[in-house]
Amino acid sequence: NYYKKLFGSGTTLVVT
């Protein structure tokens, strides 16, 4: 599992 910060949108994509 990892968390990748989506720059610009300011949201976080959570991939398990």
From Swiss-Prot:
Any single biological process term in GO: adaptive immune response
Transmembrane segments: none
Primary localization: membrane
Keywords: Adaptive immunity, Cell membrane, Immunity, Membrane, Receptor, T cell receptor
Keyword check for DNA damage: no
GO CC, any one term: T cell receptor complex
Localization in the cell: Cell membrane
Protein function: J region of the variable domain of T cell receptor (TR) gamma chain that participates in the antigen recognition. Gamma-delta TRs recognize a variety of self and foreign non-peptide antigens frequently expressed at the epithelial boundaries between the host and external environment, including endogenous lipids presented by MH-like protein CD1D and phosphoantigens presented by butyrophilin-like molecule BTN3A1. Upon antigen recognition induces rapid, innate-like immune responses involved in pathogen clearance and tissue repair.
Subunit structure: Gamma-delta TR is a heterodimer composed of a gamma and delta chain; disulfide-linked. The gamma-delta TR is associated with the transmembrane signaling CD3 coreceptor proteins following the stoichiometry: a single gamma-delta TR heterodimer associates with one CD3D-CD3E heterodimer, one CD3G-CD3E heterodimer and one CD247 homodimer forming a stable octameric structure. Upon activation, gamma-delta TR complex associates with FCER1G to initiate intracellular signaling.
Name of the protein in its database record: T cell receptor gamma joining 1
Organism: Homo sapiens (Human)
